Amino acid sequence: MPSHSVLEIFDETLPVSIDLNLARMARLLRALGSPQRYMPPAVHVAGTNGKGSVIAFLRTILEEAGYTVHVYTSPHLVRYNERIRLGGQLIADQDLDSFLKTCIRLNRRRPITFFEITTAAAFLAFSQTPADVCLIETGLGGRLDATNLIERPALSILTPISIDHEFYLGPGLNRIAKEKAGILKRGRPAIVAKQMSASSRVLEWAARKKGVPLWRHGCEWKVSHRRFGSIFQSLSSRRILPLPGLMGLHQRDNAAVAVAALDFLDQF
């Protein structure tokens, strides 16, 4: 956990309410030397449902295959350290404290949100610790989320989108899908999970505007569920997926999204 002194500074600097705005985060990252440019290749995940589970499946598969993986997720359940994993381990207390203190010092007591300062600390930690890949979950929305200063992700993933956080993201599914699609970067590929038709139209429109190659559920890949597991099939492969440890049909869908992401990356 962060030290008492760090928590006291948090109380002094954090604004009262959430304010979706990239200006504060961009300013702090510049002061830190733009660590987002020096991180291992990033997989950036946005959506309404299943983000954490997709990242958990990706991490497990990659680590079992021998890769070193950094992870940034939220919220934490018990300990603040759960938000940042370095090379398969929760970030150590002393390292977390050091990275946070650096971010707080360079922020120079200017207003910044709890999530922004945490994201900056994660990016700084990732930039200074070798790994094969970073798995990064958005906090809220996509377009104006603090994580969205990643410039060239190896891959973006859009999990199922539904109505959420309308106060911050705007009313209606189209508006929310447009905000989530804000993580798409020009020319960088994206995996799209099963979506409602309204969300699909918005995501495909956003992808066309930015020249983003899409790997979509129901088009470039699909999955069918059986009692013994699931059958995953893409344009390039066919795989039998075992039942995941996490219960529920939705978790089998989440596992298939993770497999689709790795299947796509395996082509390049």
Residue ranges and their predicted role:
Residues V69, L246-A258:
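Short glycine/threonine-rich catalytic loop with a Thr-x-Gly-x-Asp
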Residues P130-T138, P153-P242, A255-F268:
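Acidic, Mg2+-coordinating active-site environments of NTP-dependent enzymes
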Residues V16-I18, L22, A26-M39, E64-E151, ...:
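ATP-dependent carboxylate-amine ligase catalytic core
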